[in-house]
Amino acid sequence: QAAHYASPYYNYICYDGLYKESPCHVGGCLWHSFDHQRGYHPDPFYGGLMDVFRQPKYSYYMFKAQRPAVVSESLAESGPMVYIAHEMTPFSSRDVTVYSNCDEVRLTVNKDGQTYTYKKDKTRKGMPSPVITFPGIFDFMVDKKMTREKHDADVYFLAEGLMDGKVVATHKVMPARRAEQIRLRVDNEGIGLRADGSDFVTVVAEITDKNGNVK
């Protein structure tokens, strides 16, 4: 879905394409922010940037990477970001996708493992922050071998976003192991409940392994 909105291989209106239009093109839009019941059709719409419970999907982070990397106090969220769109499961792609608005991204595979680097081409036309792909670097059998050798804590992806040579954003992903707990978290965007009898808040239940990695 994120690739469809960003820059698919087929001919379709996409974010990258809108940025390549002439200056005479005054604007463009894609689709809905949330999954929802269509009303006119029995099948739900699943093209939202968030699901029906307002939990972000990969496409949310792809669009988040299009914001400027500078901090702005006038915005709810701003500044540099980096996000690894990979679950590290036996069925995950060997290619690893990363979204970031930083000038440079370093991706480290496992403790003391190989590091890969991406540098943004500032002369490229199109969307501000293209989707970053590190091809063929995930190998589930390496995870399996390290886990059997009791080194499962050393299996991870670590992405570092750099601006002017300095690390300004990080994101770490580890494979989820055996489910061991249910974790509850309040999704209130930092806004407290109002005790007037009419307010409510979303509580998200997540199944995680013993280290808190979501299954």
Task: Spell out what each predicted region is.
Residues 15, 191, 209-212:
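Short beta-turn/strand-loop junction motif enriched in small, turn-promoting residues
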Residues 86-92, 190-201:
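Short, solvent-exposed loop/linker segments at the N-terminal edge
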Residues 98-100, 199-214:
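Beta-strand-rich structural segments
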Residues 165-177:
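Edge beta-strands of extracellular beta-sandwich domains
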Residues 81-83, 97, 158, 172, ...:
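Ordered hydrophobic segments in well-structured contexts
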Residues 176-196:
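Low-complexity, acidic Ser/Thr/Pro/Gly-rich terminal tails and inter-domain linkers that flank the onset
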Residues 1-166:
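Extended substrate-binding grooves/exosites of carbohydrate-active enzymes
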Residues 113-117, 176-179, 215:
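Active/binding-pocket-proximal capping segment
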